[in-house]
Amino acid sequence: MLFRLSMAVALLAGAATSANAVTTLMWSSTADVGKTQTVSFDGQYGASVNKKTVATPLAGLSSTLALTLTKVSGKDWTFDYAVDNTSLAPVVASKVSVFGFDSRGKISGGSSNGVFGKSGSGPVPLLGSSADICFRASGSDCTGGNSGLAIDDAVSKGSLTLRFEKATPLAELSSFFVRYAAVTNADKSINNVNGTSGDAVLMADTVDSVPEPASWAMMITGFGLIGGAMR
């Protein structure tokens, strides 16, 4: 019985992991004005391995991005953004130079103000993919430059507008990333290098308190598996 119970719990856990494998944020044009969602990022840098650049996790390199929907007008969706460089020891210096994401609906253009006041699109170093839209403090497109939001800087706030190719009732954004510049750790084995985030994770305090119907269905199915195993 214990083996069957363990298998049931493992199946439920596996289903939950698969459901949350990709971080996607969604806003409704009518119901979600004023809604804030926040993602957190880790970090990685390009280590040289056998004469190849390999994306390698770097402990302590981290940041967050919060987006608040403020207005929808035709094809234009406007958000307030807040970027925080939360890097900790052993990282002693880093700057967030770019943030960006992909969209399910095609984006035809974008604009922004504040520190991250330049928009673009294109390849993201170390990720092996291109971003539909990105906003940068310096540099070109989604690569970024040498300036940005440093560890001791105040949270960077501004506004950005996404122009979709067609009017849409739902904004669905995914594949979030940030670029880091001037990354240095305590012993300087990593000194003044650029980096990119790995996985983006939806922060718990932005999750609705009531589970969505799909989540309820998964929970009920899981409880049924466990109950059956116990019998």
Segments from the language model and where they lie:
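Short, threonine-centered small-residue motifs that mark membrane-proximal processing/anchoring sites
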Residues: L2-V9, A13-T23, V193-M230
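Helix-boundary and membrane-interface capping/anchor signal
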Residues: V22-S209
